[in-house]
Amino acid sequence: MKESFNFILNDRPEILKGSLIISAFNLVLSACVMIGLPIIITQKMGFQLETANRLYGYIEGAMGAGSLTGGIIGGIFAKKIKIKNCSLLLIICSLSILPIALVLSFNLPVITSYVIIMISSFIMMMLATLFSIQLMSCLQMLTPNKLLGKVISCVMCISMCATPVGQAFYGMIFQKFSNIPQTVFFGALSIGVIIGICTIKLFRNLEETMHTNYSEI
């Protein structure tokens, strides 16, 4: 484990930066959706508790289908999606929760709002999975085979540590802004877009590094 962390810190700081990007994504967007959607569906849309729980189950199903779709797209179009475009994926993924914030801001029919939330959740998870696949593939290509398992374990450890922190944070935030939950979603997507913009140069450099490694091979 020490060898893998030394490799990440000293030899390939790009891998550390990639890990921190995934962490930031989990902290800002994933945690917001994981905490916010159950609150919205079960408490803010006026459904009976049993109905609300069932409808949230459908939302989780849509998110799972989105993840599966993102995985399939990532497998089919892996060579066509460039790592330099990952910043764009991040930005679009962040914007995919904009409809959720909007339906909470306007007095739309409940079923219409629910369908929009479901579609947005599907798209967000599809793009998030696609982003994760592309970034993890890139990080694997930058890692020697002898360290691959250890380095990927470190990356997953770093990236997953942010999720419980984000959940605790959003638990408090949604409680404080319980009457205006759309504010939380607007804030999360804004930060997500900023993160995406700030990573444009990083992903371009990663693309160049990958080409350099491939040429050397």
State each model region's role.
Residues M1-I8, L147, I173:
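Hydrophobic alpha-helical segments of integral membrane proteins
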Residues M1, I8-N10, L130, L142:
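Hydrophobic residues in alpha-helical segments
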Residues T42-I217:
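C-terminal transmembrane bundle of multi-pass solute transporters/carriers
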Residues N6-T69:
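A single, central transmembrane helix in multi-pass transporters
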